[in-house]
């Protein structure tokens, strides 16, 4: 079972749809309707933290759940990505340019969720906040960027935790299904 934390975003059920299409049983809970303890007691195989219209610290259990997930594979999307960065000490700051419904080419490290994806694939972005690159802690690797150097992907160096700033669940993102499939294959031999 995959646990999907809904940060009150319209894209949450796009994620639900894509993940279900990939054959996963998905349970959805709003970020203020379940505790971290209840999430962990469910023993999910994987966790996805959805996008949302606020900051990570306004996103209910999102940041504490990232800190508590341990070895449960976890993917953060947009706000979920920012929650991962925030949980490990990165700063979330205003982006130089607000990106609502705009695509950008994504350069990546071809590992983890990006394994086998084309370089510079187009991804849709809906955000006004970003992770400040000078604040990324040692245990986090930057895995993807825009041509201007904005962080579009991060990965924990020792835990199965990744985040993407863009929206793989949007039809406007090339290879979105494959990126999510790569996440679902974490820990599968």
Per-segment meaning from a language model:
Residues 44-116, 180-182:
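Cysteine-nucleophile active-site neighborhood
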Residues 27-33, 56, 104-107, 123-126, ...:
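Short gly/ser/thr-rich secondary-structure transition/capping motifs
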Residues 1, 24-25, 45, 73-75, ...:
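Structural signature of beta-strand start/N-cap positions in the alpha/beta core
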Residues 1-68, 79, 174-189:
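N-terminal beta1-alpha1 cap of cysteine-dependent amidohydrolase-like domains
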Residues 141-145, 149-155, 159-189:
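C-terminal and late-domain segments of enzyme folds
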Residues 78, 127, 167:
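Histidine-centered divalent metal-coordination motifs
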Residues 110-158:
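Catalytic beta-strand/loop cores that center a nucleophilic Ser/Cys/Thr
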């Amino acid at each position: 079972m995959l646990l999907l934390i809904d940060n009150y975003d319209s894209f949450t059920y796009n994620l639900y749809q894509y993940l279900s299409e990939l054959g996963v049983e998905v349970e959805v809970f709003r970020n203020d309707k379940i505790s971290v303890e209840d999430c962990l007691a469910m023993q999910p195989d994987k966790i996805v933290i959805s996008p949302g219209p606020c900051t990570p610290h306004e996103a209910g259990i999102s940041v504490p759940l990232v800190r508590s997930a341990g070895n449960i594979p976890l993917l953060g999307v947009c706000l979920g990505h920012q929650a991962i960065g925030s949980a490990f000490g990165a700063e979330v700051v205003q982006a130089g340019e607000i990106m609502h419904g705009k695509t950008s080419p994504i350069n990546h490290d071809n590992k983890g969720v990006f394994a086998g994806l084309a370089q510079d694939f187009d991804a849709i972005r809906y955000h006004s906040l970003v992770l400040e690159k000078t604040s990324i802690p040692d245990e986090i690797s930057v895995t993807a960027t825009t041509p201007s150097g904005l962080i579009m992907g991060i990965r924990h160096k020792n835990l199965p935790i990744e985040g993407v700033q863009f929206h793989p669940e949007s039809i406007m993102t090339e290879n979105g299904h494959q990126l999510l499939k790569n996440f679902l294959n974490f820990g599968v031999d």
